[in-house]
């Protein structure tokens, strides 16, 4: 099984469980338990049903997402840009390089040059 792709291995697992005739695993200490056991075929069916439902949900989301009108997003982006340009920035704009702010530090510690 080293050469199979992960998808092929995943599809092969329920087949091996159902055809292999594996008995449900029971703990020896709980042999007097009146619990119901789950056969490998039922377990494989649950796993396969879950995988099918997951794929169907993913496909439904994909196709419903494609149906959304794309022009609406462009109109929202234009109004958003307009709102951004109208809003005044609360930050002070940068000024040019000012060497006088840190000039006294160079005189105190010349070994950092």
Swiss-Prot record:
Binding site for Ca(2+): 50
Domain of life (superkingdom): Eukaryota
Residues of the site described as Important for interaction with transmembrane receptors: 54
Residues that bear Phosphotyrosine: 91, 102
Presence of the UniProt keyword Nucleotide-binding in the record: no
Residues in the signal sequence: 1-27
GO cellular component: a single term: plasma membrane
Membrane topology: Single-pass type I membrane protein
Domain ITAM intervals: 80-108
Record PTM: Following ligand binding by associated receptors, tyrosine phosphorylated in the ITAM domain which leads to activation of additional tyrosine kinases and subsequent cell activation.
MF GO annotations: metal ion binding; protein homodimerization activity; signaling receptor binding
PANTHER family named among the record's database cross-references: TYRO PROTEIN TYROSINE KINASE-BINDING PROTEIN
Family from the record: Belongs to the TYROBP family.
Protein role: Adapter protein which non-covalently associates with activating receptors found on the surface of a variety of immune cells to mediate signaling and cell activation following ligand binding by the receptors. TYROBP is tyrosine-phosphorylated in the ITAM domain following ligand binding by the associated receptors which leads to activation of additional tyrosine kinases and subsequent cell activation. Also has an inhibitory role in some cells. Non-covalently associates with activating receptors of the CD300 family to mediate cell activation.
Protein name: TYRO protein tyrosine kinase-binding protein
Organism: Pan troglodytes
């Amino acid at each position: 099984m080293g050469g199979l792709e992960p998808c092929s291995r995943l599809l092969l697992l329920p087949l091996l469980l159902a055809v292999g005739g594996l008995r449900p695993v029971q703990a020896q200490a709980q042999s007097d338990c009146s619990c119901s056991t789950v056969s490998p075929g039922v377990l494989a069916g649950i796993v396969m049903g879950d995988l099918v439902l997951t794929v169907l949900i993913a496909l439904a989301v994909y196709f419903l997402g494609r149906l959304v009108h794309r022009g609406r997003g462009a109109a929202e982006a234009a109004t958003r840009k307009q709102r951004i340009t109208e809003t005044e920035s609360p930050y002070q704009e940068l000024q040019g390089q000012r060497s006088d702010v840190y000039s006294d530090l160079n005189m105190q510690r010349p070994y950092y040059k």
